[in-house]
């Protein structure tokens, strides 16, 4: 990968939307999220998609290699410090600073800020060249995961359209758990926790927690298969089990199973979800009317 002047001037952390001290795992996760959204295969009408995707790939290579990242951070820090100093100076003080630096350059044989940044830039170029020679296995793996995710998304949408052609609409389940009305922790089940438990079975289109009845929620899945898996396998938290039952869209010939056990292999692993379902895109914006309708039905249903 040839280093470009553009790359040296870019803020790679801002490009990926991460903090400067982000760990490798956070860097890779941010890359997958950004790269998936701008992948050329998903943005054929965007002429800059390929360029941005390439920049993200370069950022991943630099920030996941310790030596290359250290060299880049040094360049970035020097550039940031210089910008901050320049910003604090008015025109008159800036002229004094420039005159002083000119005299220092004449008196000193080495060690100016410009030379230090130049040396750091050279080191960064060398590290990037080394990455090119060794081959970027991490980049190839991340791009493979993105391609796999795109394929999974397409198959999921096709399956969802096929399963829902009977005119029953999308499947909806009712969730119940023990929760006192004044319990601020909601019995241990927040919206984020419920989503984490349910999304491993398939795409969740909507999740509505009842404001009137504590310990009640309604979830809408994109496919019948995902809803069936959730009904069959999900048990919730060990200290406060979750009861999952059909509300709408139950296939004919099936019955609600008894509460499942925690047998090995009965629940999809978090690692499977992390690698294959992490980037699943929800369609919440188009379904606000359905959310309101479910809330009205839930509030009007007797306890």
Curated annotation (Swiss-Prot):
Biased composition (Basic and acidic residues): 78-106, 150-166
Region spans: Disordered: 78-124, 150-170
Swiss-Prot/TrEMBL keywords: Chaperone, Cytoplasm, Methylation, Nucleus, RNA-binding, Transcription, Transcription regulation
GO MF, one example: RNA binding
The keyword Plastid is assigned to this record: no
PROSITE patterns: DNAJ_2
Domain RRM: 178-249
Gene3D superfamilies (alphabetical): 3.30.70.330, DnaJ domain (1.10.287.110)
UniProt protein name: DnaJ homolog subfamily C member 17
Species: Rattus norvegicus (Rat)
GN (gene name): Dnajc17
């Amino acid at each position: 990968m040839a280093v470009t002047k553009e790359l040296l001037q870019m803020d790679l952390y801002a490009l990926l939307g991460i903090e400067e001290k982000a760990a490798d795992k956070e860097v890779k996760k941010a890359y997958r999220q950004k790269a998936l959204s701008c992948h050329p295969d998903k943005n054929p009408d965007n002429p800059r998609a390929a360029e941005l995707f390439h920049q993200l790939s370069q950022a991943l290579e630099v920030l996941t290699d310790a030596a290359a990242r250290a060299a880049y951070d040094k360049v970035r820090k020097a550039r940031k410090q210089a910008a901050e100093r320049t910003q604090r100076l008015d025109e008159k003080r800036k002229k004094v600073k420039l005159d002083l630096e000119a005299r220092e350059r004449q008196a000193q044989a080495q060690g100016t800020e410009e030379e230090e940044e130049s040396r750091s830039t050279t080191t960064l170029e060398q590290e990037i060249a080394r990455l090119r020679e060794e081959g970027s296995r991490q980049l190839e793996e991340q791009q493979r995961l993105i391609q796999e995710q795109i394929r999974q998304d397409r198959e999921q949408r096709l399956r969802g359209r096929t399963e829902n052609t009977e005119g029953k609409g999308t499947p909806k389940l009712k969730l119940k758990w023990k929760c006192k009305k004044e319990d601020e922790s909601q019995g241990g089940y927040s919206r984020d926790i419920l989503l984490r438990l349910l999304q491993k079975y398939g795409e969740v289109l909507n999740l509505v927690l009842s404001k009137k009845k504590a310990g009640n929620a309604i979830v809408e899945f994109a496919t019948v298969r995902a809803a069936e898996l959730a009904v069959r396998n999900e048990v919730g938290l060990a200290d406060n089990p979750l009861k999952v039952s059909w509300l709408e869209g139950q296939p004919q010939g099936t019955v609600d199973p008894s509460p499942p056990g925690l047998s090995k292999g009965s629940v999809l692993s978090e690692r499977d979800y992390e690698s294959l379902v992490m980037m699943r895109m929800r369609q919440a914006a188009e379904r606000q009317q359905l959310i309101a309708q479910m809330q009205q039905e839930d509030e009007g249903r007797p306890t």
